[in-house]
Amino acid sequence: MKKILKMIVIIIGAIIALLAGVYAYYGGFSKITFNEIERGGDVLVYENVVGDYKQAATVSDRVYNILLNDYNIETFKGFGIYYDNPANVEKSKMRSEVGCIMETMPGSITVSQIETQFNIKELPQGKYLSIEFPFKGSMSILVGIMRVYPALNKYIERNGLDSEGAIMEIYDVPNKKIIYLKAI
């Protein structure tokens, strides 16, 4: 009986250690640091989305693949601009803009050609609250949601900032980070 109990404790300990390791790998213990930065001018190619934010990955992949395959434009940063707080808005009514950040435009392609399939705009120049979080795959996005948004809400409240307004998430693949931006 003692051997079985000891084995159960070892198995439970191993599972907890494994879960803690996975959580740490995807940024679960990363320090959340807030910076006020000037940013803007990024060219955003996107689709408007209404409904559950879980659609974002599928939409982002679609925009990426069409830009790559139809226009020969390779992008390295995806993004989502999320307008509604899921705690206050019904999932079916949540609004977002999801797509890719276009860093260069091939000479043979015009903005009007891309606008036949997607919306295009520039990120407004301005002051943003910025948080960087490690990006090591889609699990990092989920861990980021659990870690960054509660910390962001506390920061906004502590500093008397406006809690309304969109949050932008930039998925910077080459630099392996998610950048959260909120206009201030």
Feature locations, PLM:
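A solvent-exposed interaction/effector surface
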Residues: 2-184
